[in-house]
């Protein structure tokens, strides 16, 4: 994962960030081709009481300057982009700033 907050993203000319609806809630969403998986922040999950499930085994996620241990995920959360809805599997991270990071797993589908 290359970015974890909005300030980092805004400094990079080759990144795409926008606001989209995740299960009817507005979220800052980053499209990150450097991320192998897709993520959602713990704060966003808690704020909107989104359903989570335990990962089969915890996952170590690394980003520049930080490591996170992830143990939860959100199964098939609806992400609305324009008139299209994409069911999205998102790993829950204890990160701040960005609500959702869409990685190559999401972008390749």
Predicted regions and their residues:
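Acidic, Ser/Thr- and Pro-rich low-complexity intrinsically disordered regions characteristic
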Residues: 1-109
């Amino acid at each position: 994962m290359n970015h974890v907050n909005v300030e980092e993203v805004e400094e990079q000319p080759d990144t795409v960030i926008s606001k989209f609806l995740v299960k009817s809630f507005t979220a800052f969403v980053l499209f990150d081709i450097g991320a192998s998986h897709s993520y959602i922040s713990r704060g966003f999950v808690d704020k909107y009481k989104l359903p989570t499930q335990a990962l089969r085994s915890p996952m170590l996620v690394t980003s520049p300057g930080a490591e996170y241990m992830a143990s939860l995920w959100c199964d098939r959360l609806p992400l609305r982009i324009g008139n299209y809805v994409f069911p999205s599997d998102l790993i829950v991270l204890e990160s701040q700033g960005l609500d959702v990071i869409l990685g190559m797993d999401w972008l390749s589908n």
